[in-house]
Each structure stands twice: as structure tokens, then as C-alpha cells.
Amino acid sequence: MFDISQPQNGEDGDIKGFELAYQHAFRFLPAPFDNLGIQANYTYVDSSTPLVDAITGERLPLPGLSRDSYTLIGYYEDDTFSVRAAYTYRSKYLNSVGGAASGGNTYIAARGQLDASAQITLTPNLRLTLEGINLTKAIDRQYLGEPDRLTFSAQEDRRIFFGVAASF
């Protein structure tokens, strides 16, 4: 005898929301500040499914979908040098649905991360790059029902990359 299982699409679900984006280059500033700029975006999503939380009785959102997320970017860019810093955030989200006997649903906690990069063109044929990912060493957390019922926690390492691009 074999037990066979497979993913199955849900019957119904609702998603409502909006996204805002803004970008501005400060070209009106005196040199060298005229090469500065910012970018920002924000997304709000309200979702629901027919699935009901076994403990609270409330309708559950779509798994994997945060209610709030945003990115803030500051940059400087000219013909030979560029630098960029970006902070990205997403609010908690439902990871998986569980019954009352299992202690409830699992969620991934809110998380923010800072990344940065720089690039310099030394000659038309030689460019150096430096990139830092997760400079704030953000922590990934998963919990069961409530944030104080932690089931997983891992501090992501900061990653630094250096690159050389040459053309012949």
C-alpha cells in the first residue's frame, strides 16, 4: 500500500492592495551632489482565503504574502563611480497552516536587510566592484502562532563580494 500526496490549488482567495513608487535624481544640486538620488517603493496587500485559523477562528491570509513591504535606496552615480545602499523590509507572513493540535500556523517574522554596492571604472577596459549583502546581519525567525513560540532562528551571515571585470 502507498500513500500518495500532492499539492492542490485552493478554492478561493482575495487579494487587494496597492503599490507606491518614487524616484528622484537631485540634478538641481551643485556638483558633485547632482549625482545623488533616491528610490522608494511600498506595497500593501490584504489577502484572505476560505481557510480558518483553528485557534482564533479568523480567516487566514494567503501563505507567503506579507501585508507590508518596502525598499528605500540611496545612490550616487557618475561616469566613473557609483555607490548604492538599499534597505528592504517585509512584514510577517503565513508560512504554513496547522491545526489546533499542532499548536497552530507557522509564520515567518518580519525582517529588514541592508545591502550596499560600489563600482569604479578605472579604465574603459577595467572595472572594480564591491558588494555587501545583509550588512545588518538580519535574523530569520519562524514561529508557531505567536512570536514567543519560536521554532526556528538563524542569523544570516553578512556577505561581501569583490569583483574585477576586464575586457580585452
Description of each model-found segment:
Residues 101:
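Acidic interhelical loop/turn segments
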Residues 2-97, 136:
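Gram-negative outer-membrane beta-barrel transporters
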Residues 77-78, 108, 122:
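Structural motif
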Residues 89-98, 119-168:
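C-terminal beta-signal and adjacent terminal beta-strands/loops
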Residues 67, 109-111:
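Short solvent-exposed loop/turn micro-motifs enriched in small/polar/acidic residues
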Residues 3, 13, 109, 128-131:
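Generic secretory/membrane-interface signal
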Residues 7, 59-60, 104-105, 149-151:
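Short, P/G- and charge-enriched loop/turn segments at secondary-structure junctions
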Residues 115:
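Mobile, glycine-rich extracellular loop/lid and propeptide segments
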